[in-house]
Amino acid sequence: HPIQNYRISSSFGSPTLWDTVSRYCQKSKIRLPSLRRILIAGAPVPGTLLKRFEFILEPDCKVLTPYGATEALPVTSIERQEIVDDTLARSEKGEGTCVGKPVPGAELKIIRISDEPIPKWEEGLEIPKGQIGEIIVKAPWVTKTYFNREDVTRLTKIPDGKTFWHRMGDVGKWDKQNRLWFCGRKCHRVIIGLETLFTIPCEAIFNQHTDVKRSALVGKSSNREPVIIIEPENKDRVAKDREIFTKELLELGAAHPHTRSIKKILFYPDFPVDVRHNAKIFREKLAAWAESQ
């Protein structure tokens, strides 16, 4: 009602907020013609949400999904229509979430993944286009240090002459159009022998199931066993036919090379998420729970 009563033209919100609003509007056949610009950030934006906007917004309303962090915002941006027309189908097949091209003034690189401090920038750190690596950014608005946290500053900043690169703590890759594809948090990757599984590409496969609200990849047994935890859209289904539901999900995973090694499915009624955006999944809490299952 405030959007309609005050004829709001611009809005910023998390994917969870807009998922709730858009579901209500579609169900109640409500359109929001005053909106001209919407920014959605805080977590990857589901394709189902972007498609739903077609039913409630005017065609000229721009829906932007910028990518960034507290230390560096914005970094890249992409508009809804480009996602729906060009990248969404690839995201659903597990390529990651396309977050667009760097904004003016920001320089991005993809480097080989490391959990250690990098003492200085070297050209050999960068990896070829198309490979998943660690995302780093250089821009005038990026924070230089963490207050009284020299250890964190050393771990997240790469000196480069008189400037520096900031390590986003995320993994991703470039496509042929020089767009960035987000593949999850670096610390959430699951390493099994010579194979590394990344959260966003893996979860996208299981999220295609109509009875899945969202999913989370975690590692059990000291990160050696990959597990997909499902928050069901229909909680009754888990109670009634858990075995068939699990079989359907495992078949989905087996159909794609990057999820073929996932053999364990668990169900969790309501995922723990961050208070601010109500969208970031606390995978660490889910991983701790999975250890006891």
Question: Which residue stretches match the model-derived regions?
Answer:
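C-terminal boundary motif of the adenylate-forming
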Residues: 120-122, 169-171, 208-233, 261-263
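Conserved C-terminal helical docking segment of ANL/AMP-forming enzymes
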Residues: 196, 209-214, 232-269
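Active-site glycine/GP-rich loop and adjacent strand/helix microenvironment
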Residues: 41, 50-51, 69, 75-78, ...
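Conserved ATP-binding/catalytic segment of the ANL
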Residues: 117, 125-192, 196-199, 208
